[in-house]
Structures are given as structure tokens and as C-alpha cells.
Amino acid sequence: MLKSSSLYAAIDLGSNSFHMLVVREIAGSIQVLSRVKRKVRLAAGLNKENELSEQAMERGWQCLRLFSEYLRDIPAEQIRVVATATLRIAKNADIFVAKASEILGNTVHVISGEEEARLIYRGVAHTTGGAEQRLVVDIGGGSTELVTGTGAKTTQLMSLSMGCVTWLERYFSDRSLTEENFAQAQQAAKAILAPVAEKLIQQGWQVCVGASGTVQALQEIMIAQGMDELITLPKLERLKQKAIECGKLEELEIEGLTFERALVFPSGLAILIAIFETLHIENMILAGGALREGLVYGMLHLPIEQDIRQRTLRNIQRRFQIDIEQAHRVQQLAEHFFIQVSKSWQLDNRCRELLSSACALHEIGLSVDFRQAPSHASYLVSHLDLPGYTPAQRRLIASFLRNQKGIIDLAPLNQQNALPINQAYRLVRLLRLAIIFASRRRDDTLPALRLRTEDEKLIITLPHQWIAEHPLRAENLHEEIQLQSYVHWPLMLEEQNNSRIG
């Protein structure tokens, strides 16, 4: 049975949905136990005088009655409940908040837009990799937060009065998806962005991170359609045209777009296009967390690590009792191989990091069983929470682990969208070779070998007489030559006297 003192809960009463996150603290990290989301559309219940309707408030209270059961075994001081844009502006918010606090047995805090932006940034900083300057964009139901910062430190916090629910009611109220409706929605968003745009552009950023349901929906669409994970303006424009072709909200069908997200997708899309155009954003990635994660990490008082991925890898290695020395051995060899072929094979630093991550986790499948360990490894990584990695990167690493040895299955490599397929193929080849050469699990048995490429042909130069002195690994290498040939990956061995041996 879980000790109640290890449980934490964060509840976000948003303008579109109410969310609850329940986690357990484990050795300085969090394990997600439950995520509950209910579409309440509170903002849709605001009238022209900014008063919430009784029906909208009842929808919210009913949702909180459901949430309250989860909270009974969690200490009150380990629960944070916040309300955002709609309850900031509703004239009768006090009525809703009083009853909501009573239902939950915990105070509901209506937070300012700036505080919301700060919490969103904290959630992103704790869960999304990279030490670069960031621009974080979160399109909510009633407001949009824009935050710049580096590491744990924010430099600008902005909360703007536009959201996917309010824009739905204002610019798509007839439920028509027309050029005119989109143009009006985008123009209105640009007008709100105009006073802050220059300041944000001058501040600058190296990576743009999206932390909202709209961005999550875009990721799901791109995955379903086999696109890479980077969100760009041309992709947004293509999706807008597809929406316009559907004509009506009720008839909106885009591959990968769920029914649940469809209603507010066009309005969120219009706001996002306006943000891209106004701020000249080249591309955007999906955040690993936002407001609720910011609340949880705030209660835990955990420092923000610069290298979130390393923390994630350490935690998983510890949890699954992975042989860290062997993982490091394979990492070192793979790094050695990577350096030698990266230029000719056009492999960048992003490739290097993902290859290293796969090396760190390659033996995770042994925690289930030796037989079919690569399949077990792939399954585990596909379903584990990996802070610092995007969903596409997680799928890529899983595809690497599936193909770390044995017969090569190209399907998962072809289906991932984190890297170009040729780069994924090349990294798998390096991983497989590093595992073979490190198979004796001793540092003093690693050969001083060289790799070079001729287009897709990979040539390994071994020390003189190495093959004769290491018959088991030599046999594994000859088998590997055969396995790679089945998928048209030429692999050749030679010894330093230039004699070709395979």
C-alpha cells in the first residue's frame, strides 16, 4: 500500500477543461499515478457581462465531485488547486470558488496570468530537455501564456486575453470553417500580440516549446500522418486548408484529430498561426509538461536540472537495475564509432544524443526476461514516462532497442518521425556493432578499431590477428554481416594488414 505522504495532487480549473494530476515522489523524481481530464468548457458559460451561467458552474462542480474521491487519501498540504483565465474575469467567480473549495475540501486559488505563466514555465523546465533559451507558448481556453527563459530562470512572463474557447465563441460561433472566419480570428490574435511582439523578438530564443492542448493535437495529427515532429507554419497552413475544406465544425475530419479535441481545434489553430507569423517562429516542439507539473514540482521543491535527460536515464537505470558499467561501455564504443562516421554519414549532435540514450537503456529488457529482451526493451521504453524526450524521440529509441540485435525489423524505424529514416538506419548499425564489441563486459577487451564509410557501405578495420584471437565475437560479426545484408546494409571487415575478411 502506498504511503499517503508520498502522494501529491495538482488540479487545474481551466477555461476549457478541468485536469487532475496525481503523482508519487520516488527518490527525487515523480511517478504519475493518474491523469484525469474532463471537458467542462467553463468559458462558454460566460455572458456579455462576464457572469458564469448556473449550468456552466454545475458542470464544473460535478467534475470536482468526481475529483474529490481521488483526494481523500492525500494530505491537504500536498494538494494544489488553481483556477485560471475564466475565473479571473468572471464577476460571480466567488460563488463558484466557494462551492468548489467545499467540494474538494481544499482551497481553490484563482491565480494571476503572470503566476500561471511562471508555473507553466516551471513545468516545462522540469520536463523538457535542453539548456537553450526558450520561448514557451501555452494556448488555454481563455488565455494564452508566452514565457521566455533559460534553465530555471524566466526573463519575461506574459498572459494574453485570447484562448481557444473564447475565440471559438467569438469567431466560429456559426460553426463555419471559412477563410473569412480564420482571417478574422488570426487578425484579432495578431492585434493582441502586437504590443508585446517586439519585446519578445528582441529577447530572442533558441527553441520554441508548445505546452497546450492545441499543440498536443497537432502532434497527434502529425504522428498519424507520418510527418516529423517539428511544428512549422507551412504545416499549420496545410491543416487550416484541410479544415476549411471540411466546411463545418460538425464535419471536421482530419486524420489523427480526435473527436474530443475537434471542437476547439480550429480556434486554437488560428491563434497559433497568428503567433507563428507575428513572432517569426521557425518551428516548435511539444513540451513534456506545463501548469500541473509546475504545481507538483513546486510542492516537492526539487531543483531544476540542466540535463533532464540524464536524470531520466539515471532513474530508469536504477529502477530496472540496469548494469550501468556495461551501458557506459557500449556508450563509449558507440561514441567512438559516431565520431568516425558522423561527417560522411551526416549525423548531427541530435543523433549523437539519441544514440547515447539508446545505449544507456539497451539492457532494460533483461529485467523482464533474456528471451526476446529487445522486444521487451522496446515495449518498456514505448510506455515509460521519459521526461526530457519528446513522444517522437521515445518512439525512435524504442525502435533502436527493438533492433539492437537479431533479425532487423525496418517497420518501426520507418514509422518513427524523430529523425530522417536514413539517419535512423545508420544509428542502429552503430548501436548493434557497439553491443557486439562490448559483449565480454570488460574494458580491457575493447579493440582499437576504425570505421569508415563508402556511401552506405560500412567498413570496419580491426587490429592484426584480432579475428583469430577472438573467435566468438568474430562469429557474431560474420552473422551481423549477413543480417545487415538482408536489409541491404553493406558491412565489411578488414584487418590492419588490409586483408578483407568479410
From Swiss-Prot:
InterPro entries: ATPase_NBD, GppA/Ppx_hydrolase, Guo-5TP_3DP_PyrP, Ppx_GppA_C, Ppx_GppA_N, PyroPPase_GppA_Ppx. Pathway: Purine metabolism; ppGpp biosynthesis; ppGpp from GTP: step 2/2. Its EC number is 3.6.1.40. SUPFAM superfamilies: Actin-like ATPase domain (SSF53067), HD-domain/PDEase-like (SSF109604). GO terms for molecular function: guanosine-5'-triphosphate,3'-diphosphate diphosphatase activity. One of its GO terms (biological process) is guanosine tetraphosphate biosynthetic process. Keywords: Hydrolase. Pfam families: Ppx-GppA, Ppx-GppA_III. It catalyses: guanosine 3'-diphosphate 5'-triphosphate + H2O = guanosine 3',5'-bis(diphosphate) + phosphate + H(+). Catalyzes the conversion of pppGpp to ppGpp. Guanosine pentaphosphate (pppGpp) is a cytoplasmic signaling molecule which together with ppGpp controls the 'stringent response', an adaptive process that allows bacteria to respond to amino acid starvation, resulting in the coordinated regulation of numerous cellular activities. Belongs to the GppA/Ppx family. GppA subfamily. This is Guanosine-5'-triphosphate,3'-diphosphate pyrophosphatase.
